[in-house]
């Protein structure tokens, strides 16, 4: 997503088109419901690893979408706005840190 966004932003900027992306983390949806139970290894991993300590709610994406669609982002292009509760900040760290 990051490289595609950057490449497209570079190519389309001359046409006054901004290209940005939203990088979602792990969200509570009907598809993730079967694994969002206490004791499920992946659920426990997400809860432990995400600094926010929870799965995201789909409504958490609204702010990012509104910002990128607004005049406030007129000079923003080639960026991915990660809405992930901070999980990317933990990549490469031991799980107990």
Where are these regions (language model features)?
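Short-chain dehydrogenase/reductase
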Residues: 5-6, 62-65, 69, 74-88
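A glycine/serine/threonine-rich, flexible loop-to-helix segment
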Residues: 26-49, 90-97
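Conserved catalytic Lys-bearing alpha helix of Rossmann-like short-chain dehydrogenase/reductases
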Residues: 1-5, 19
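Generic structural signal for alpha-helix termini and adjacent loop/cap motifs
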Residues: 38, 53, 70-73, 92
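Rossmann-like NAD(H)/NADP(H) cofactor-binding core
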Residues: 15, 20, 79
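A conserved structural motif in NAD(P)-dependent oxidoreductases
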Residues: 50-61, 72
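Alpha-helical segment proximal to the catalytic Tyr-Lys
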Residues: 10-14, 74
């Amino acid at each position: 997503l990051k490289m595609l966004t950057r490449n497209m932003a570079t190519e389309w900027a001359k046409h006054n088109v901004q290209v940005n992306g939203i990088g979602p983390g792990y969200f509570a949806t009907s598809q993730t419901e079967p694994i969002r139970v206490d004791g499920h290894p992946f659920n426990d991993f997400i809860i432990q690893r995400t600094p926010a300590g929870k799965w995201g709610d789909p409504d958490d994406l609204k702010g990012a979408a509104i910002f990128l669609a607004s005049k406030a982002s007129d000079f923003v292009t080639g960026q991915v706005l990660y809405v992930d509760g901070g999980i990317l900040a933990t990549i490469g760290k031991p799980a107990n840190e």
